[in-house]
Amino acid sequence: MKPSFFLLAIFLLSPFSAIHSYEPGAKPVPIIFDTDITVDVDDVLALAMLHTLADRGKCEILGVTISKVNDLAASFVDALNTFYGRPDIPIGVGENLPSRDSKYLALVKERDEDAFRYPHDVEISQEAKKAVPLIMRLLENADDKSVAIIQVGLATNLAPLLEADGAMELIEAKVDHLSVMAGAFETIRGNNRYLEANVRNHNPTKTPLSSIQTYYYR
């Protein structure tokens, strides 16, 4: 049998490293959380962790943006935010993205008699705001060099953000920390087509990156 391999990403600087550096008595870190919350449940746990940190006064969730399209993705995020007592967190959805199926998002439609089991106001993703304008508005209203953007999915929101008019200057002024869980930034098997390169090469703020190692097994 030919050797197979896994790519294992080892996070030298975690997506939550901005909060990890929090000092007692400091102001909560303003967070914009960008997620591909559709297929895997890990992003649900990551958002739940952010809410727990917000409960402890370590961060403030300014907004959540979604980088994959599913009719129920924004509804699920709204239900999760509501469950943790923050129903008014703005939610943005990326534009012109392919639709993705999900095995768990349908939970948001479950009802107990005539009410949603998990209360929420956003009933379909199309009701949510557009991701890039939302991020820019949140940054405009933030203090200088205060915001941490945490991307734990595709770069389908951050890449167009960097290309938006005035976005580079806005990011440089408002963002203190950009933490990206992304893919490869260099040529792999002759393939150079990676959206993450836009974030690495053209982002004017601190960007923790994860290293990738290849492990072989038989």
List each model region and its residues.
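Positively charged n-region of N-terminal signal peptides that target proteins for export
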Residues: 1-5
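N-terminal acidic, glycine/proline-rich low-complexity segments
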Residues: 18-218
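Bacterial N-terminal signal peptides
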Residues: 7-15
